[in-house]
Design a protein with these regions (language model features):
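Catalytic and substrate-binding clefts that recognize carbohydrates or anionic sugar/phosphate headgroups
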Residues: 42-44, 48-100, 173, 228
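A surface-exposed beta-strand-loop module
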Residues: 243-255
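Polysaccharide-binding surfaces and accessory modules of carbohydrate-active proteins
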Residues: 62-63, 68, 108-110, 124-229
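Extended, loop-rich substrate-binding clefts of extracytoplasmic carbohydrate-active enzymes
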Residues: 78-131, 223-244
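Beta-strand-rich N-terminal accessory domains
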Residues: 1-67
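Conserved small/polar residues in nucleotide/adenosyl-binding loops
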Residues: 255-262
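Short helix/loop capping segments that flank catalytic or ligand/cofactor-binding pockets
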Residues: 23-26, 36-39, 44-48, 82-85, ...
Length: 262
């Protein structure tokens, strides 16, 4: 069964059937900052070593597979419906929505079309800077103005893989989060000068720094409470599990061609 094809011109492998029987991963970064991401945006990022300097979390052998990840959610504020640019974690029916993944040379692009909205999310790590860039583009292909909210989400690691998985009585107090001027900062209390951050090139309309506040009780990345409600809660704390979620409300106007013939 064929799930994709090579795009020789762009030097990409294009996965246009995303319900793969196993994970198809790509490696980002060529120097100190690296990431491993799969065809549905699941994966993690690390600095130099994935054992001692993980930036974002990953749960090996998890169900559903390859969680968590580096996700972007879109919410239609007219009816409360929401989806993710990558097929997972929301997992809209493939009969209702179209998804693609493009694995390139040290970058990956996720594409979706749903309810007259086409969107893309490109993950890449530049050679000169130890950062992961999320390039998100949204286009209104429908015949009406659209009121949307866009949410980012990644789950921060405590840096050491053992701390992420053992002795929660201690590890839940080894990091804290804060928010100021559009920047989420995650501080590691047991590492001198240890911190990581999440920000964007826009003024956010909301944020969440706490994973359990963004996701909500008895929920998963499939149906986060902040996305369902349409508003992040502004959470932060000196302890607990932390995430990077920034919210941006946008109005997508109708597309008009500069040519009167179109």
């Amino acid at each position: 069964m064929q799930y994709g094809h090579f795009d020789n011109e762009k030097r990409e492998y294009v996965i246009d059937r995303v319900d793969l029987p196993a994970s198809w991963t790509n490696y980002l970064g060529l120097k100190d900052m690296c990431a491993v991401v799969n065809h549905t945006a699941g994966g993690y990022m690390f600095y130099k070593t994935p054992e001692y300097h993980r930036i974002t979390r990953f749960r090996g052998n998890s169900i559903p597979m390859d969680r968590p990840g580096h996700y972007v959610y879109i919410r239609d504020n007219s009816d409360g419906d929401y989806w993710s640019i990558s097929w997972q974690p929301v997992g809209k029916s493939l009969e209702e929505a179209a998804y693609r993944c493009r694995h390139g040379m040290s970058y990956t692009v996720y594409e979706s079309e749903y309810k007259g909205i086409s969107a893309s999310q490109k993950l890449s790590i530049p050679l000169q800077d130890p950062v992961e860039l999320w390039d998100v583009k949204i286009k209104n292909d429908s015949d009406r103005k659209r009121d949307l909210s866009v949410f980012s989400y990644c789950e921060f690691s405590f840096h050491h893989i053992m701390t992420d998985n053992q002795n929660f009585q201690m590890s839940m107090y080894c990091a804290g989060s804060s928010y100021e001027d559009g920047i989420i900062e995650h501080d590691l209390f047991y590492e001198e000068f240890g911190f990581q951050y999440f920000t964007g090139n826009f003024e956010p309309d909301g944020f969440d720094c706490l994973r359990d506040k963004f996701i909500g009780p008895y929920r998963t990345e499939d149906n986060p409470l902040s996305v369902e409600k349409g508003q992040c809660g502004g959470s932060f704390e000196l302890g607990n599990n932390h995430c990077g979620s920034l919210q941006k409300n946008i109005t997508c106007l109708l597309y008009t061609s500069p040519s009167p013939r179109d």
